[in-house]
């Protein structure tokens, strides 16, 4: 799947596979303006941190295209900020806009010529999209070493090709394990209220021929207690400098259950999802979404009128519950403050920095003696 984010250079239109309609219908949502991109981001036409970032980059191309006249620089800045503020939790959104801003500054900033800048913007956005696919495949190969032949992997939400420019993060790990010849099956929990697991993860894996079963969110404890889950792999929307991880609401509960049942819990995310400016999870903004997502199923209202609704889109899993963070640089292990810093600064890729190209097998080798949860399973 490599055409769910597609920019038409002839018409200057951004085509996004409308994920709200899956799996019943495959149709594109076409963005012709900054406001179209913001709408697509906010209504989850497109979702998933890396995919949001790539969409934002192409949105900046549209912002520049709209910014005509003597005040083009001010209008471009306004459009880019509008995109960057569309959703608060996924750090890739701001990261992508700032990367495009760097292209602008390199071309002379406000003193530059907007005509050649448009070509530079389009090239930068395409480069970002291509890089994300390559990063996901590299990340997947590192993460595949964490999956054993015969494992059943539980995943939450959708961190697959749809959530990235292609291949996926959590699902990229599963895809890479299957490509390496391992027999892997998946339990996709439904992920209320937007049902990304039931609608999107199951759709992706079924198309790939990877065995997948959908389970209710509240069945997780039972599944683990019966030994039906050997690994958990999830994606991330923002990772703090200490390893605390924001992901789809419900992830924290899955992590707590995994710890209780001694099941390894991995986060798979590119380094662009790490926010070194946020020391810990307390500083990660948590998006609240419309009540309608909870109160209605399609056009049918499920809840009584006038009953308040809480619809937090994300929660934060403390780093202490994460067995490893799978990145394109390798698998990061505790202490995450050190291993994240080393990975971001392109320093050691050795175990002394808490980074490994595969899972640590000996507890004595693990930085700060991260437990090997698989050894404690009964």
UniProtKB/Swiss-Prot annotation:
Residues 362-371 have a biased composition (Acidic residues). It comes from Desulfovibrio desulfuricans (strain ATCC 27774 / DSM 6949 / MB). It catalyses: 5-(methylsulfanyl)-alpha-D-ribose 1-phosphate = 5-(methylsulfanyl)-D-ribulose 1-phosphate. Pfam families: IF-2B. It is an enzyme of class 5 (isomerase). GO terms for molecular function: S-methyl-5-thioribose-1-phosphate isomerase activity. The record marks 157 as: Transition state stabilizer. One of its GO terms (biological process) is L-methionine salvage from methylthioadenosine. Belongs to the eIF-2B alpha/beta/delta subunits family. MtnA subfamily. Keywords: Amino-acid biosynthesis, Isomerase, Methionine biosynthesis. This is Methylthioribose-1-phosphate isomerase. The active site is at residue 237. Substrate binds at residues 47-49, 87, 196, 247-248.
């Amino acid at each position: 799947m490599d055409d769910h984010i597609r920019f038409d250079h002839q018409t200057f239109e951004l085509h996004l596979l409308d994920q709200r309609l899956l799996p019943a219908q495959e149709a594109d949502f076409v963005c012709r303006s900054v406001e179209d991109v913001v709408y697509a981001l906010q209504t989850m036409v497109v979702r998933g941190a890396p995919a949001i970032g790539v969409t934002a980059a192409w949105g900046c191309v549209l912002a520049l295209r709209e910014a005509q006249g003597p005040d083009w620089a001010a209008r471009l800045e306004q459009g880019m900020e509008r995109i960057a503020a569309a959703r608060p939790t996924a750090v890739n959104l701001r990261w992508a806009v700032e990367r495009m801003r760097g292209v602008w500054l390199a071309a002379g900033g406000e003193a530059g010529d907007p005509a050649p800048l448009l070509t530079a913007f389009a090239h930068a956005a395409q480069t970002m999209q291509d890089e994300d696919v390559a990063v996901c495949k590299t990340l997947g190969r590192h993460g595949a070493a964490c999956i054993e032949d015969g494992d059943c992997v539980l995943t939450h939400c959708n961190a697959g090709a749809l959530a990235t420019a292609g291949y996926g993060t959590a699902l990229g790990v599963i895809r890479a394990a299957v490509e390496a010849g391992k027999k892997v099956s998946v339990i996709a929990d439904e992920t209320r209220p937007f049902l990304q697991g039931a609608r999107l993860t199951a759709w992706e894996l079924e198309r790939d021929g990877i065995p997948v079963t959908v389970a209710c969110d509240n069945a997780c404890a039972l599944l683990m207690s019966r030994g039906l889950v050997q690994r958990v792999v999830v994606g991330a929307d923002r990772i703090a400098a200490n390893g605390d991880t924001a992901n789809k609401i419900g992830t924290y509960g899955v992590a707590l259950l995994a710890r209780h049942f001694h099941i390894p819990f991995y986060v798979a995310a590119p380094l662009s999802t790490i926010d070194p400016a946020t020391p810990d999870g307390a500083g990660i903004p948590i998006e609240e979404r419309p009540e309608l997502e909870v109160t209605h199923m399609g056009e049918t209202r499920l809840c009584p009128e006038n009953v308040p609704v809480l619809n937090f889109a994300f929660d934060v899993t403390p780093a202490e519950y994460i067995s490893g963070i799978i990145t394109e640089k390798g698998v990061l292990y505790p202490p995450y403050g050190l291993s994240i810093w080393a990975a971001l600064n392109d320093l050691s890729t050795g175990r002394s920095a808490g980074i490994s190209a595969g899972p640590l097998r000996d507890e004595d080798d693990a930085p700060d003696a991260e437990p090997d949860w698989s050894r404690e399973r009964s």
